[in-house]
Amino acid sequence: MLFELIFIFLARVLDVSLGTVRMILVIRGDRIPAAIIGFFEILIYTVALGLVIGSLNEPLKLLVFCSGFALGILLGSILEEKIALGYRGVQVTIDSEHGHIVEELREEGFPVTCWEASGKAGSKLVLNIFLKRNMAVAVADKIYEKDPDAFVVFMEPKHFQGGYIKKK
């Protein structure tokens, strides 16, 4: 009985975590990996569900099944943050006086496109940076170190073509 409860719990944690990753892949347009993950996700889910459906007179199994689902959501979202698949666009607006930030980022290998803009408080620079998703927060932190008043917007591009992307 204990082994079965542990199995149900871990199966739910695993299948829901896989489901989170699968959904991210679908949104990004990675259909084949999403389909493969989906196969294993539903296989694991069906086995766990079968153990619970066959024992509806044992509420502990249902509680464990639901608890595994809840923890799977939490772990799936943490896993998704850690693997950080894909790319992110970062648009930054800074005061023109902080123009040195552009060259510093380029020296570090970041692909920065920059243009002048006019804001309520004067002349601004708008920086457009596309990079691997796991690097986006680090770039924003570098910018905030130099200009705490920077306005930073993160975007999730679904498709893009051409240009330069920092690889590491």
UniProtKB/Swiss-Prot annotation:
Transmembrane stretches, start-end: 1-21, 34-54, 59-79
Keyword Secreted among record annotations: no
Compartments where located: Cell membrane
CDD domains: YitT_C_like_1
Highest classification ranks of the organism: Bacteria, Bacillati, Bacillota, Clostridia, Eubacteriales
Keywords associated with the record: Cell membrane, Membrane, Transmembrane, Transmembrane helix
Protein name, per record: UPF0316 protein Swol_0526
Similarity comment: Belongs to the UPF0316 family.
Keyword Metal-binding tagged: no
PANTHER family reported in the protein's UniProt record: UPF0316 PROTEIN YEBE (PTHR40060:SF1)
A Pfam family that the UniProt record links to this protein: DUF2179
Membrane topology: Multi-pass membrane protein
Organism of provenance: Syntrophomonas wolfei subsp. wolfei (strain DSM 2245B / Goettingen)
Annotated InterPro entries: DUF2179, DUF5698, UPF0316
GO cellular component, one term: plasma membrane
